[in-house]
Regions:
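Long, C-terminal-biased catalytic regions of enzyme "large/alpha" subunits
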Residues: 1-202
Length: 202
């Protein structure tokens, strides 16, 4: 990353143009390239080698993110990503896929405050999972069958910048969704000290 920043700055001086070092979303490419690579090189390492050997769709870990099943400890992941994410000059975001069934506005506010007071990442999203039942509408959490009437539900989660039905994602992204560890916002990492600092806003 430091090398790419240096090269980018050299190009800026040489051309007079302004360039960004961006974390590309690669939402489709992570699956497409893994699929092509595994067809040509069956032993190549993907993000999900065990599941792939058992017939699951292959995919690569996106950009410089940690593997989706690395940890459910939000503060451990924030600490590991903080230095990397701040090296980009644009187009970067860390999605926090929360395992809480129903995060209150106050809990979200407190989490954002804790993150912005202790980390330097430029962009984060709090990304819950929810479901839509044809009869009962919005259902908090991941339910492929409605907990009230057992009807088929559409499960929504974030892909790129949008909340979309998981069943419309490509096979690799659907496998990533299955593999993903959701963050437990109540889990305080033993490896990370997060201070409660005074905030300038309330």
């Amino acid at each position: 990353m430091d090398f790419m920043r240096t090269v980018l700055e050299d190009f800026q001086e040489e051309t007079g143009n302004i360039y960004n070092l961006e974390a590309t979303p690669a939402e489709s490419a992570a699956y497409r390239f893994a699929k092509i690579d595994t067809e040509q090189y069956p032993d190549i390492i993907t993000a999900n080698p065990e599941a792939f050997r058992e017939g699951a769709a292959p995919y690569y870990t996106n950009s410089t993110h940690l593997p989706v099943n690395y940890s459910d400890d939000i503060f451990e992941v924030l600490t590991l990503q903080d230095e990397l994410q701040t090296k980009y000059t644009g187009g970067t975001v860390l999605h926090l896929f929360t395992g809480e069934k129903n995060m209150s506005g106050l809990a979200a506010k407190n989490l954002i405050r804790k993150i912005t007071n202790n980390f330097r990442l430029p962009y984060i999203t709090i990304s819950p999972t929810f479901s839509i039942c044809p009869s009962h509408g919005y259902v908090v959490g991941e339910y492929f069958a409605c907990p009230k009437c057992d009807a088929d539900c559409e499960v929504y989660s974030r892909i790129v910048g949008y909340m979309r039905p998981v069943n419309q994602w490509n096979n690799g992204k659907q496998q990533e969704f299955k593999d993903r560890k959701l963050f437990n916002i109540n889990k305080q990492s033993k490896k990370v000290v997060v201070e409660e600092k005074e905030s300038t806003f309330s």
